[in-house]
């Protein structure tokens, strides 16, 4: 599940990962979006289900439905917006309270506008280590850093390396939970 404040670039990151596309003309996500992405790990193809949650306050009550059974949460912030970075702590707490086994990756978006940076890599790395997470810095606009961050996250957190089996499991409602 992708989580983060409004306008940090969650949907743009997903579009770059899945379609290798970016549009400056993007409308905010309403409610939640759904995508599938196939990731190759150890010569196996893993199907991930990606839930793109809206960051607007009026939709925040919907998010727990999607991270309750998630295997992983991708917490996105805007490196040019310090407030969006400080909110990552609340996102991690909310997910951890509902789903203690959920794994995290912290993603700083908008690396293409370095001159407007408000959050240092060192600060983001430090916070990610507090969550036992990895930190990735990307630009959905240019594609910088996009090549490996989801594959690394899936490899590190969602694949049982001893048996090389998917950890994505069916919940009681028959739907799979994932990113």
PLM regions and their residue ranges:
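Conserved beta-strand segments of the P-loop GTPase G domain that flank and frequently precede/overlap
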Residues: 50-51, 74-78, 105-109
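Switch II (G3) loop of P-loop NTPases
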Residues: 45-60
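The beta1-alpha1 cofactor-binding region of Rossmann-like NAD(H)/NADP(H)-dependent oxidoreductases
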Residues: 53-56, 82, 143
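Switch I (effector-binding) loop of TRAFAC-class P-loop GTPase G-domains
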Residues: 18-47
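WD40-repeat beta-propellers
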Residues: 49-51, 84, 91
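Conserved P-loop small GTPase signature centered on TRAFAC-class small GTPases
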Residues: 1-11, 15-18, 40-45, 86, ...
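Eukaryotic intrinsically disordered and solvent-exposed regulatory patches
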Residues: 23-25, 34-37, 60-61, 92-93, ...
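Inter-motif core of Ras-like GTPase G domains
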Residues: 59-81, 88, 94-98
């Amino acid at each position: 599940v992708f989580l983060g404040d409004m306008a940090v670039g969650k949907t743009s990151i997903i579009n770059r990962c899945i379609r290798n596309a970016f549009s400056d003309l993007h409308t905010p996500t309403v409610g939640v979006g759904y995508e599938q992405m196939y990731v190759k790990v150890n010569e196996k193809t893993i199907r991930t289900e990606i839930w793109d949650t809206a960051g607007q306050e009026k939709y925040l009550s919907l998010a727990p439905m999607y991270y309750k059974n998630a295997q992983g949460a991708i917490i996105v912030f805007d490196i040019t917006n310090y407030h969006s970075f400080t909110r990552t702590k609340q996102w991690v707490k909310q997910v951890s309270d509902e789903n203690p086994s959920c794994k995290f990756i912290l993603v700083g978006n908008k690396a293409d506008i370095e001159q407007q940076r408000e959050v240092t890599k060192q600060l983001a790395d430090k916070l990610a280590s507090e969550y036992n997470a990895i930190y990735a810095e990307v630009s959905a606009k240019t594609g910088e850093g996009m090549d490996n961050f989801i594959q690394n996250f899936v490899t590190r957190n969602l694949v049982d390396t001893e048996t090389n089996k998917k950890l994505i499991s069916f919940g009681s409602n028959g739907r799979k939970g994932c990113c």
